[in-house]
Amino acid sequence: MNIDILTLVAACVGITSLVFAAKGNVWAQILMIIFSILYGIISWRFHYWGEMITYLGMTMPMAIWSTITWLKNPAKNGKEVAIQKLRLKHIVWLMLFGTITTIVFYYILAVLNTPNIVFSTISITTSFLAAFLTMLRSSYYAFGYALNDIVLIILWMFASLKNRLTYL
């Protein structure tokens, strides 16, 4: 059995981040910054440029921004973030920027000859959705991460079939 330690550590950090996020704890965002760096390195090794660009160029900066907004907007008990209700303007911005992000990154990934380009592009879209909703302090962020997890399972199944590595 061939286990990649970096992938194992990244998975543990990522899962821990999601647990803290579910509790509305700002440590979720700090762990997401660390996870983004680890995941960027793993993605680079597999030439999954979309994943690398997404996590280092979008998820990590959004996690930094979310750390700031979460610290500035604590709930009344002071232990978690105050949830913000999504408004129509948030949904419009989400759809507009999500569409632009998807189109732009599809072409970037095509130029970089990214393997599994369709799933890589969908992963960028779902990552954007999750990061944007997290930054907005919306409880719907988990929906974005759940969609992204489904896409990532498919994407990394392709990678493991190609490289015959066992990740977990």
What are the language-model segments listed below?
Residues 30-34, 50-54, 143-147:
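Hydrophobic alpha-helical membrane segments of integral membrane proteins
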Residues 35-38, 57-58, 148-151:
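Transmembrane alpha-helical core residues of multi-pass small-molecule transporters
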Residues 46-62:
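Alpha-helical transmembrane segments
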